[in-house]
Structure formats: structure tokens, C-alpha cells
């Protein structure tokens, strides 16, 4: 239990969490990964760290209580070296990043509706990777406003920056020549075959999107812009092409929201208190206005100068977002036994 009378130091909460055997997942081939941490003291980043075992990693996190914790999608022969040449690159996982603030109408506030939209895009990406490339992948919530999809297969580990960029462009539809995918009728009235849900690649995705919208497959051109919006995935191309990118450690806390980095399934994503280890009822003094929003399953609105009673996990998130500060109460940090399986 962490007392919040007179204010709440987020580092104390994070330290309490990491001391309770949290559900942190071990990255594959841990000894070949570079680790990096952002600390609370001056927001300093510490990089080029290596661990030989999960015990070493957990001990470090319990001692330092990092604000953010990362590992490299790359494997290196010497991960603690300071230059790429010295590290000895052995291959990288294929990583995709979806940030919901890039979606129309979504901004800094962690609204459930925007998270739901981002999740649906991430699921679409996972399904397309498997259907079109034969690559299984794993979906994660980043603990703030985004989702990561990671694929770790033999051939994709060896891809260079340009190959990764082309795969990313496939999902963003950048450079798409639609006339080659869905040709229009010819001058003599010859009508090309309409797309089918069983077609490979983009034709199949457009056909399935059309059926979901109730659009006749022979008339997809009339609704093509909406259909392209339905199949496009708003990933950050720069993230995918970067072979030295860092991913968040699953089970760690995101210092921008105080929420878990969580592995997700494809059956649905319902933001709620299960994403936070913090429990209790606290007082929160608002310093900024917040329009009514649905956050982690609760409706929240704020007016500057007012004091609100609210659940600790909501208050911690709002404090880290800069909407005010916890002014009183007690926060209970859950032990590992209470976790929903990740």
C-alpha cells in the first residue's frame, strides 16, 4: 500500500509493482537482446544493457523501477556494445506499430473508443500477415495509446530496411496502383472479373470489406475509397523498417499512463481496470479541463481546480497525462496472484 497524502510519487508506485513478482515476460533469446530503460530521475535513458537471465532482468527492474522498459527486436552477438558494427547483428523480428492518435478524431486522451479502433486495425494486420505472408505474429497493447505486432520467423529476421519498408507499404497502401488490382471495364465493354473473398492479397481484402458493407462485388468501384479505408492499416512505416528498434517489455508499465504492456488475443479487447496494478479510491485535484471521455470503462470529465474522488488506476493515468495530481488516499498495488492471464 502506498499512501498518497500530500501527493503521489509515480516512482514509488512503479517500485512497489516491480517488487511484487510482476508478470513480466522473458524475451526470446534474452542473452542476445539489448535492453534500454527510461528512469524517473531526469527522464534519463540508459541503453546498451544486457542480461544473461530473467532473474537478472527482474532484479534490475525491482531495483531501478524504470519509467519505461524496452528490449531490442534485434538479436546481437554482443548486445552491450555501443555501435551496430560492434554489436554484431544476427537478425531482427518484424515489428509494426499502430498509434491511435494517428486515427481521425483521436488524440492524447486514452479514450476507449479510439483504443477499440486501433485494436481492430491491429487484428486486421495480424490476420493479413498470416493470410498473405504465411507469418504468425503476436499482438500487444503498449500500455498507452498503441499496439505492437511482432513476427519472429526465419526469413523475416534477415530482411533489410528496404524489404521491411515494402512490407509496411503493402499495409498502408502507399504507392498503390489500384487499376492493376481492380481494373475498370475496357473500352469495348469487356468487364474484368470482380474481386472475390477467396482472392489472394488486396483483392481478397477489398472483396471481404465490400461484403461487410453490403456492397455488390460487381460495383466495388463505386465505394472504393471507403473500402480502401477499411483495409488500410495505419502503421508507422519508420518503425517497421528500423532493424534496431526497441519494443516494450511485456508485463512492464508504460510511464505515460501507468498501464500494463499486455499480450492480447484476437477475440476482443475491452479496456478496463485489469490493465492496471493500482487499486483503491483516491482524491484527485484537476489542473486541466477534460471533456467527458470513456476511459478504462469509466466516464470521466474534469474541471480545473476541482477535487474528485476516483479509482486509483484512473487517477494515476490522469496524473501521468498531466491533468492534475493525486491529493489524498491510499493506493494498493496488486500482487502477481491477482492478475488476469496475459
Swiss-Prot record:
It is an enzyme of class 2 (transferase). It holds the Pfam family DNA_primase_S. Its EC number is 2.7.7.-. GO terms for cellular component: DNA-directed RNA polymerase complex; primosome complex. One of its GO terms (molecular function) is metal ion binding. Keywords: DNA replication, DNA-directed RNA polymerase, Magnesium, Manganese, Metal-binding, Nucleotidyltransferase, Primosome, Transcription, Transferase. InterPro entries: DNA_primase_S, DNA_primase_ssu_euk/arc, DNA_primase_ssu_PriS. One of its GO terms (biological process) is DNA replication, synthesis of primer. The active site is at 97, 99, 236. Its cofactor is Mg(2+); Mn(2+). Heterodimer of a small subunit (PriS) and a large subunit (PriL). Catalytic subunit of DNA primase, an RNA polymerase that catalyzes the synthesis of short RNA molecules used as primers for DNA polymerase during DNA replication. The small subunit contains the primase catalytic core and has DNA synthesis activity on its own. Binding to the large subunit stabilizes and modulates the activity, increasing the rate of DNA synthesis while decreasing the length of the DNA fragments, and conferring RNA synthesis capability. The DNA polymerase activity may enable DNA primase to also catalyze primer extension after primer synthesis. May also play a role in DNA repair. PANTHER family: DNA PRIMASE SMALL SUBUNIT. This is DNA primase small subunit PriS. It comes from Aeropyrum pernix (strain ATCC 700893 / DSM 11879 / JCM 9820 / NBRC 100138 / K1). The gene is priS.
